[in-house]
A protein has these predicted regions:
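Conserved interdomain hinge at the start of the Helicase C-terminal
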Residues: 289-335, 341-346
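Conserved Walker A/P-loop ATP-binding site and its immediately adjacent core
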Residues: 131-165, 243, 335-338
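Conserved helicase ATPase core of P-loop NTP-dependent helicases/translocases
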Residues: 157, 170-182, 329-333, 341-342, ...
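Conserved pre-motif I regulatory segment
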Residues: 48-55, 73-77, 81-123
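Conserved RecA-like P-loop NTPase helicase motor core
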Residues: 356-453
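Walker A/P-loop
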Residues: 116-139, 381
Length: 460
């Protein structure tokens, strides 16, 4: 029999207090997950650690962002604890409407839900107007100290321009490697977060995290989104949430529960995104068993980067597109720099550019401008820097040459090509059904990711 049970809620951590030790132990085990590769750890081998990360400790303490999940699990066993909320939250907010901008219904509903719930991971596909949602939240809460975290300077710059030039908001500051402008509302890359600790760590009431899935694994990035002890408004934004338990619980614990805004297929059906035709090229197995004793890196180098047959297929696709289209805009994404340079040399076409992380922002914008403005068909080759944060609506064809497994990487890359533009009614996507060790399972995963989003998939 339970004599007492209540949850004390604070900004960063909350605590379940009860005399039912069995219940606490059950939650301790339920919120425990094995860390990948734990069996190789010295601590595990010496029996000093069981290989688990725990999100609910033996004293009943857990991250407040997991409160909704904990309450749901308690309800399953007919437990309804009293809630003691120790937070001091200013629930007043200003109007979130932006001048000369009309929200889609799902955008306005998301802003309203964020202001009501105060802690949410907003799952919104590429092209759904995530930055517009951020703008509405910032305007509504603009009288508070606020931090918006980014993992890339390019995303920060785009958001700064939107908030200041489109939304006409004031008191907006920026902080990144070589730049600093103070503002009560501070846009900051996680790499430069140390520069705002004195001014914003203790007083920030609102924390927003762009591309928040990028923050839930690294020690520094996770520590950043778990900080800010007075930030009772906490919002993350991503197109794809983590599927593995540890990063998923890291993210929810620091921010809050996931709220799905709308699906990509919904946006396509409503005419807000371009319909993709995904074509999977069925490649023959070319390793003849030589891949069996190779590591992943060796397989990738041999059968992706240096694979002449596969690379020549990409060249043939590009040539075929150019023959059939006068002004095609072809995006090719690679995982490695060497692969990008190999394809650049192989294609050797005019109006072709290769972008990498080392390129400055001005170099990137110049390359994108050339890509857009070419009178004939043009090709843009890039690495991960083109996966997120770059809006090139003119893309008509997308070749995913990376052979990656990740759902996040696959769908974010696809999202680059789906934005609407007057020059296209559909976008053609090319990917590969590779067969070699590791690559075969990764190809099947990508196919599954495409189908999960209800896209049309054709095998060539």
């Amino acid at each position: 029999m339970i004599v007492y049970m209540h949850i004390e809620i604070n900004t960063q951590n909350s605590t379940l207090r009860t005399d039912n030790a069995e219940l606490v132990n059950a939650l301790y085990e339920l919120y425990s997950f094995k860390v990948q590769g734990y069996q190789y750890s010295r601590a595990y081998k010496s029996h000093r650690w069981d290989g688990s990360k725990r999100f609910f400790n033996r004293k009943g303490v857990f991250r407040t962002g997991l409160l909704t999940r904990v309450l749901s699990d308690l309800k399953k066993v007919d437990c309804s604890p009293d809630l003691v909320d120790n937070r001091t939250v200013n629930t007043n907010h200003s109007d979130y409407q932006l001048d000369n901008i009309t929200y889609y219904p799902y955008q306005e509903e998301t802003i309203q839900k964020c202001l009501q719930e105060k802690r949410l991971v907003v799952k919104a596909p590429t092209g759904s107007g995530k930055t517009l949602i951020i703008g509405g939240i910032v305007k509504a809460l603009r009288d508070r100290k606020m931090v918006i975290l980014f993992n890339a300077k390019q995303l920060l710059n785009q958001t700064y321009e939107f908030l200041t030039e489109v939304c006409n908001l004031e008191n907006i500051g920026v902080c990144f490697g070589e730049g600093y402008i103070y503002g009560d509302i501070m846009l900051c890359t996680v790499q430069s977060i140390d520069k705002i600790l004195d001014t914003h760590l203790e007083d920030t009431e609102v924390l927003l995290v762009d591309e928040c899935h990028e923050f839930c694994n690294g020690k520094t990035t996770l520590a950043a989104i778990e900080s800010f002890p007075k930030a009772n408004y906490r919002f993350g934004f991503t197109a794809t949430t983590p599927s593995n338990s540890i990063p998923k619980y890291n993210l929810e614990g620091a921010i809050g529960p996931v709220h799905s805004v709308v699906t990509t297929s919904d946006l396509v059906e409503d005419g807000k995104l371009t319909k993709p035709i995904i074509q999977l090229i069925d490649r023959p197995y070319s390793a003849s068993g030589a891949d069996e004793d190779m590591s992943y890196l060796e397989v990738y180098e041999e059968y992706i980067v240096k694979n002449e047959e596969r690379n020549n297929t990409i060249k043939e696709i590009v040539n075929d597109i150019k023959e059939k289209n006068k002004r095609a805009r072809i995006l090719i994404l690679t995982k490695s720099l060497d692969h990008g340079r190999t394809l650049e040399n192989l294609l050797g076409v005019e109006c072709s550019s290769f972008l990498e992380g080392a390129d400055s922002l001005s170099e990137r914008y110049q390359a994108i401008s050339r890509f857009r403005g070419c009178r004939d068909s043009s090709v843009l080759i890039g690495t991960k820097i083109l996966q997120t944060g770059i809006n090139i609506e003119e893309i008509t064809h997308f070749i995913n040459a990376r052979a990656m497994k990740s759902e996040i990487a696959t769908l974010q890359a696809l999202g680059r090509a789906l934005r609407k533009h007057e020059t296209k009614e559909r976008v053609f996507v090319y990917d590969f059904l590779d067969k070699e060790k590791y690559l075969g399972s990764h190809a099947r995963e990508r196919r599954k990711h495409y189908k999960k989003e209800k896209h049309e998939v054709v095998i060539l």
